[in-house]
């Protein structure tokens, strides 16, 4: 008999119902649960799939470059970055009538095109690309890397090239290579690119392979490096009148500490960024020599962890046993990696707009809004994934004997205290924040706005003042001219920084008031509640008072288990599922706040945010309703416009989102009856009944229906807000 899907589980392959298909898809990547899997094959499969992932990433980025080179207007945009709209790619659609063709023919194109709101034009321009030829060669190079990655993935599955388990578990070597090789060498290489290509490019010099060796990046070459006069590399920086991409007002410095922004591009100084990457490179190259491998020198991570025991004796055995626990658990490692990546992605969102690195990106408002929102959503999904794998670690990989009285065991011992404190914090934040908002709503409704409770965020204002913001009058640290901090940096980076922080046209340390205070606490509520659900899911994953043997049931289990009705509500999967809703909720508030504050900043009517953000009706009316008017008006009796596609996507997003509720509210019996009715009708319909299936149709389990509902809810939620964000911003600022 031919092997049926799924081949990796013969038990599932023999299931006579449609469960075979859905469970097969659900467990396709759960290598640990596959038939005849060994630890060695598990590691090798994951290793090979990493190369496949890299191949896809390189192919995708290659496609970005290729389509812009082929159908974009990069060369025209380079001539006038502030007024030419960057084109992502052409649109070919046989349904377009004349009005649609006219509406979407923009940016100097000959036919309908998509405008790029990803910031790639600004990025490529900043790093020294100037022509379509440059873009094509970049695309080809990435395509080559993609092919190499595929080849490497295939190669490492061949018997001769399969790494052994001991190779995968050699933590010191891996850390050394990742610190020195991945971060150190690549940062050094990037510094080299900035110094040799990007900085000359910003000064009007076109450096490529043909003249790379003949153009000195600095007039004195490597002299200052070898004679120890490194400060010469910082002398004669670009002047404040420098025109980016030309020699007008350009200097010769390559590694500086100017602080603040380039006045014309409103982005960080390229020479500051080169200096930053050089410092990072040196730091990581050193860090990559810290751990003991072949030569018997350096730290052993196991020894470090075994020595980490709190000296008082009242805090248990600290990090004892952690080395083997982490090194033998892929889920623990993945959880740590995802948690780190999630934090860094959110930091990217915060820093891309407040400290823009790419020339002219700060003046491209729609791109700024899109990139902030994009990175915050990605961060949210990655963070929830970190806790999911943390919970799987506790179920599959945690060994109580190996971790007696160490930090992991003590987390489990104290889980009631941890969960109840998170619960208390969430309740406190929720009731107080909502109470303030609702009080203010009532005061406005009764025509007495002066009776609102408005709280100034004085501690946050004090922190901003300490960083040099003078408008609050705190006169502390960098905002005080006679503080030691001020005097120490006065001759180097401070003038540029202070100029930037006190200039109201950028997003560095925005002025904050009572509206910010309230929304800050609303976001804190969302973060604490999301954390509560995720932490409880992980800490209760092995067992709870209600279900002490939970670990034997795995990460997700059905509600109609053996005499255990309703138990799927307490599986670790269910905690993840609930947390994603709260995560989306929280990021909704974060992005609403960011977007509304910036729209009013860019339009020059900051008072609208300040006055309307202190009560809920203000958010609903003056942010959501007011800014969705163009979307609701995307199709009207006068034909269509360039926002019509977003109006359609806004509706479509709502549809997908609402479909989610159908799966979330109805349970298994509903689907079973529906499916049996459909199957009955199918079998009695002429022609249709010629098509037969071998598997007996069974309904989604509750766990599956929740997954389908969650997927629709998330996708619809994000589509709806993406359309709203891009249309409301591009509709205002072009």
From Swiss-Prot:
**GO CC terms, sorted:** chloroplast thylakoid membrane; photosystem I
Binding of chlorophyll a B1 occurs at 654
Domain of life assignment? Eukaryota
Q: Where does [4Fe-4S] cluster bind?
A: 559, 568
Q: Which residues cross the membrane?
A: 46-69, 135-158, 175-199, 273-291, 330-353, 369-395, 417-439, 517-535, 575-596, 643-665, 707-727
Q: Write out the annotated subcellular location.
A: Plastid, Chloroplast thylakoid membrane
Q: Which keywords accompany this UniProt record? A: 4Fe-4S, Chlorophyll, Chloroplast, Chromophore, Electron transport, Iron, Iron-sulfur, Magnesium, Membrane, Metal-binding, Oxidoreductase, Photosynthesis, Photosystem I, Plastid, Thylakoid, Transmembrane, Transmembrane helix, Transport
* Binding-site residues for phylloquinone, renumbered to this chain: 671
Q: Which GO terms describe its molecular function?
A: 4 iron, 4 sulfur cluster binding; chlorophyll binding; electron transfer activity; magnesium ion binding; oxidoreductase activity
Give a Pfam family name.
PsaA_PsaB
Per the entry, the cofactor note is: P700 is a chlorophyll a/chlorophyll a' dimer, A0 is one or more chlorophyll a, A1 is one or both phylloquinones and FX is a shared 4Fe-4S iron-sulfur center.
Q: Catalyzes what?
A: reduced [plastocyanin] + hnu + oxidized [2Fe-2S]-[ferredoxin] = oxidized [plastocyanin] + reduced [2Fe-2S]-[ferredoxin]
Looking at the keywords, is rRNA processing present? no
Supply one GO BP term: photosynthesis
The UniProt record lists the EC number as 1.97.1.12
Binding of chlorophyll a B3, residues: 662, 670
Q: How does it sit in the membrane?
A: Multi-pass membrane protein
Please describe the quaternary structure of this protein: The PsaA/B heterodimer binds the P700 chlorophyll special pair and subsequent electron acceptors. PSI consists of a core antenna complex that captures photons, and an electron transfer chain that converts photonic excitation into a charge separation. The eukaryotic PSI reaction center is composed of at least 11 subunits.
Q: Give the family per the record.
A: Belongs to the PsaA/PsaB family.
This molecule's function is given as: PsaA and PsaB bind P700, the primary electron donor of photosystem I (PSI), as well as the electron acceptors A0, A1 and FX. PSI is a plastocyanin-ferredoxin oxidoreductase, converting photonic excitation into a charge separation, which transfers an electron from the donor P700 chlorophyll pair to the spectroscopically characterized acceptors A0, A1, FX, FA and FB in turn. Oxidized P700 is reduced on the lumenal side of the thylakoid membrane by plastocyanin.
The name on file for this protein is Photosystem I P700 chlorophyll a apoprotein A2
UniProt source species: Lotus japonicus
Underlying gene:
psaB
